[in-house]
């Protein structure tokens, strides 16, 4: 018995403790189910419930599951592309589905025969989102509602983080009539390592794919046209639809808005297939990007290197004055990630000339991300040291006139605490194809060239060395501003017993292609039971994408010890 007194009046209520202690509890449920992007895929969610007592123990009673409308009032017929198996409690969603909201209601009986029920609201969402008040009849058809209370959670799979308010006039016919304003981040779970075409109707500032304080996201809006960034739009005062290509390295696409009004976002996955021949993309600063640098010359003159072009096409992606931070925030790494096709190669190593405020071990985390990002997008990675110091004012030590030898190979924190450490940590990963020591090889090639001074037309070793020294306008740059191409040519082609960059690329690619792997053929009966397994030695160059049918699966793996697929899905 409970006695309640309010304003001088007393009411006595008798409660049945046994009845109230029994209830229904969902033992498995999901509040959000994503519409798959792939026509062959099906997204499922499991729902189950039990009648429990006051101590939470399952009483073992029957519970039925039914589908009701979003308000949990009337039974609801699921639209095309969505089905519910009540006996198994499975909601299945195909790519034919459209966004909708419904309720899964669980019903059972208490010990005295009274009806017990509990419900969970389920949002089936695609990747088209209408931002606004969330009022009934305000969400544009085919879009999923995002309102001030739609906070991002792992379970929901989409939503916002930050402070927002709803503004504008809600309309079911116009997705831009209302919007959310403020400083906030929108997140949506997507498939890891894929490229997405994202349409955003907004005003204000936008940054995509925040990683860390150092890699604070690709800046997508500028006040005016400029050449510092790529993949951006000019900031507008009015809500305007903009389109961006966004590579997503992890499984969450994030868009950070500042001083913004956001009306809608649509996200579409872009499928990419392997090129007829792999591409080599090169991450770097001006030491590879500028006129006269080895990467600039190799990309321009690669027809002169048929042994390399038979294996891959080379691209110079160096950008002057960039560091690990700005190469990312200004979109240049994204530009590579966008263009990567399965089986492409990325070289990473010439990005330490401009420290960008980093020192010591601080280089390693951004470099690790660069590697992880390229691998996630389907590329293989070759790590390199970077080009040598020139023997100019302040760097006279680079050439020793007594021993007639160069020592320009850099040994700073970027190199010794960054790129070389990463290679040692990852060298057993088959997707890290190798390490090319550009700086050390340059020293050795220069030294052999100097030792061969007479053959090369010089009076003595120092004269030959001076010809190399004269290629450098400063300690970083060589072969530019009309200077001799000798230093760059020696780096590219090597000299004597020292290999050049071209032959090293050929070596690494050839060794990778000839690496052994295992072809695994599995046979299944109609019930999915494995009935036969065959393994055959193969080479990486022979590997194909997984071939599936109802009764068979053919895949290629590096080895049984290293169960990594040669070609990722």
Predicted region positions:
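Short, solvent-exposed loop/turn segments at the edges of extracellular beta-sandwich modules
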Residues: 7-9, 109-114
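Proline-enriched interdomain boundary motifs that mark the N-terminal boundary
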Residues: 22-30
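Alpha-helical cap/lid subdomain in secreted, periplasmic
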Residues: 48, 332-484, 489-493
């Amino acid at each position: 018995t409970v006695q309640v007194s309010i304003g001088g009046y007393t009411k006595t209520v008798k409660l049945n403790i046994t009845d109230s202690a029994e209830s229904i509890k969902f033992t498995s449920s999901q509040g959000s189910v994503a519409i798959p992007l792939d026509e062959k895929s099906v997204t499922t969610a499991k729902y189950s419930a039990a009648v429990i007592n006051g101590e939470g123990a399952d009483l073992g009673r029957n519970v039925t599951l039914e589908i009701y409308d979003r308000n949990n009032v009337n039974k609801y017929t699921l639209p095309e592309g969505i089905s519910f198996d009540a006996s198994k409690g499975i909601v299945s969603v195909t790519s034919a589905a459209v966004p909708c909201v419904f309720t899964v209601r669980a019903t059972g009986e208490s010990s005295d025969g009274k009806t017990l029920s509990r419900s969970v609201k389920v949002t089936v969402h695609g990747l088209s989102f209408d931002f606004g008040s969330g009022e009934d009849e305000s969400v544009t058809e085919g879009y999923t509602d995002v309102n001030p209370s739609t906070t991002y959670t792992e379970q929901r799979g989409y939503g916002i983080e930050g402070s927002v308010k709803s503004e504008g006039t809600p309309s079911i016919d116009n997705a831009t009539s209302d919007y959310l304003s403020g400083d906030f981040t929108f997140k949506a779970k997507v498939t890891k390592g894929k490229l997405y075409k994202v349409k955003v109707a907004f005003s204000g500032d936008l940054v995509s794919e925040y990683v860390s304080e150092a890699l604070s996201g690709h800046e997508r809006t500028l006040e005016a046209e400029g050449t510092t960034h790529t993949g951006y739009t000019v900031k507008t005062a009015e809500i305007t639809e903009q389109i961006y290509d966004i590579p997503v390295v992890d499984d969450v696409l994030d868009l950070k808005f500042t001083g913004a009004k956001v009306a809608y976002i649509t996200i579409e996955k872009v499928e990419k297939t392997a090129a007829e021949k792999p591409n080599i993309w090169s991450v770097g600063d001006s030491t590879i990007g500028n006129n006269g640098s080895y990467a600039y010359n190799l990309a321009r003159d690669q027809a002169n290197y048929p042994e390399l072009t038979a294996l891959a096409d080379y691209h110079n992606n160096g950008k002057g004055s960039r560091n690990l931070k700005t190469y990312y925030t200004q979109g240049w790494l994204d530009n590579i990630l966008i263009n990567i096709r399965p089986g492409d190669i990325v070289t990473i190593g010439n990005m330490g000339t401009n420290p960008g405020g980093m020192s010591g071990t601080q280089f390693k985390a951004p470099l690790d991300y660069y590697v992880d990002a390229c691998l996630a997008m389907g590329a293989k990675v070759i790590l390199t040291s970077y080009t040598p110091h020139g023997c100019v004012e302040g760097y006279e030590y680079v050439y020793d006139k007594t021993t007639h030898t160069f020592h320009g190979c850099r040994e700073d924190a970027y190199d010794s605490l960054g790129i070389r450490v990463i290679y040692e940590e990852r060298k057993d990963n088959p997707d890290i194809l190798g390490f090319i020591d550009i700086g050390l090889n340059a020293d050795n090639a220069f030294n052999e060239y100097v030792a061969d001074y007479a053959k090369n037309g010089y009076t003595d070793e120092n004269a030959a060395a001076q010809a190399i020294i004269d290629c450098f306008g400063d300690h970083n740059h060589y072969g530019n501003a009309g200077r001799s191409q000798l230093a760059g040519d020696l780096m590219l082609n090597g000299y004597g017993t020292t290999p050049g960059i071209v032959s090293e690329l050929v070596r690494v690619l050839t060794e990778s292609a000839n690496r052994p792997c295992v072809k695994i053929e599995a046979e299944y009966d109609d019930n999915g039971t494995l009935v036969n397994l065959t393994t055959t030695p193969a080479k990486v160059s022979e590997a194909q994408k997984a071939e599936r049918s109802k009764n068979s699966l053919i895949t290629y793996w590096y080895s049984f010890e290293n169960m990594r697929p040669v070609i990722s899905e």
